[in-house]
Amino acid sequence: MSGFVEKPEPLQVPGLVHLHTGKVRDLYQNEAGDLVMVASDRLSAFDWVLPTEIPDKGRVLTQLSLWWFDRLVDLAPNHVLSTELPPGAPADWQGRTLICKSLKMEPVECVARGYLTGSGLVEYNETRTVCGLALPEGLVDGSELPGPIFTPATKAAVGEHDENVSYEEVARQVGAETAAKLRQTTLAVYARARDIARRRGIILADTKFEFGFDGDTLVLADEVLTPDSSRFWPADQWEPGRAQPSFDKQFVRDWLTSPESGWDRKSEQPPPPLPQHVVDATRAKYVEAYERLTGANWS
């Protein structure tokens, strides 16, 4: 069992139609037919949307995505039309709302990996492959790969888990030409972002993108290169062979699996609320990622 511990009720905003409540984002449509994407402070872990929110998280995700979009536009156009608050929207939406093009979304999570960890490490330890791609012997948790690889995954609903799939399966789903575009653009955007992050003392271990089509044009959508969609590691603490310190929700995962939480991940019971010290530390991680990447102070 998984999903929302406490599913939020969507806000009723004049002129907007609620379309979907996701793990983090609420999606609406305005009268012009554009999408209104609102990033909440919700946090998910182990396929559960937790009952405790992380203050400012949605704003950090939105502002960091906008910062990255500006630096990637020559590689991939993005879906953002405006950051103006829709008329009648609550003040709390300020800084966490994007007005976006409505796209024909591709049913694939486009994952790029430059380092081995997470589900990729699990598969590698069993088969010496990741998504069907053969990798050399001797790699450990945190190893840098010989080169970035494209390891797509299925898109899962709230409460379900993304599943890694082969490139060949993606080509069967979306067609060879589109699959090639997805792979090429994913790896190009990853390489650009990896180099930018590296200059700021951060390793971009892996990340996932979502794409859609606006006519014949492939467009980068959703969020990009945030602590929710990426693994960011401090470069000065990188040490292959162990779990790496990170600027993301790993702190929450660690607490949930610790004796302190009292939660059994294998049970069907929902996870407990987060204590204040975990909330504060997690918020600090998200803010630090924003500040180190952008060079700007969070306020």
Swiss-Prot record:
Under the heading InterPro entries, the entry gives: SAICAR_synt/ADE2_N, SAICAR_synth, SAICAR_synthetase_CS
Going by the record, the broad EC class of this enzyme is ligase
E.C. number(s) listed in UniProt: 6.3.2.6
Annotated region described as Disordered, given as residue ranges: 259-279
**PROSITE patterns for this protein:** SAICAR_SYNTHETASE_2
The protein's matches in Pfam families, at most eight in alphabetical order, are given as: SAICAR_synt
Give an example GO cellular component term for this record. cytoplasm
- List the keywords (alphabetical): ATP-binding, Ligase, Nucleotide-binding, Purine biosynthesis
SUPFAM superfamilies linked:
SAICAR synthase-like (SSF56104)
Q: In which pathway does it act?
A: Purine metabolism; IMP biosynthesis via de novo pathway; 5-amino-1-(5-phospho-D-ribosyl)imidazole-4-carboxamide from 5-amino-1-(5-phospho-D-ribosyl)imidazole-4-carboxylate: step 1/2
Per the record, the GO terms for biological process are: 'de novo' IMP biosynthetic process
Q: Which reaction does it catalyse?
A: 5-amino-1-(5-phospho-D-ribosyl)imidazole-4-carboxylate + L-aspartate + ATP = (2S)-2-[5-amino-1-(5-phospho-beta-D-ribosyl)imidazole-4-carboxamido]succinate + ADP + phosphate + 2 H(+)
Q: Name one GO molecular function term.
A: phosphoribosylaminoimidazolesuccinocarboxamide synthase activity
Record has Zinc as a keyword: no
The answer to whether the entry has keyword Lipid biosynthesis is no
Entries under NCBIfam families matching the protein: PRK13961.1 (NF010568), purC (TIGR00081)
Query: Which protein family is it in?
Result: Belongs to the SAICAR synthetase family.
**Name of the protein in its database record:** Phosphoribosylaminoimidazole-succinocarboxamide synthase
Taxonomy of origin reads: Bacteria, Bacillati, Actinomycetota, Actinomycetes, Kitasatosporales
User: Which gene is the coding source of this polypeptide chain?
Assistant: purC
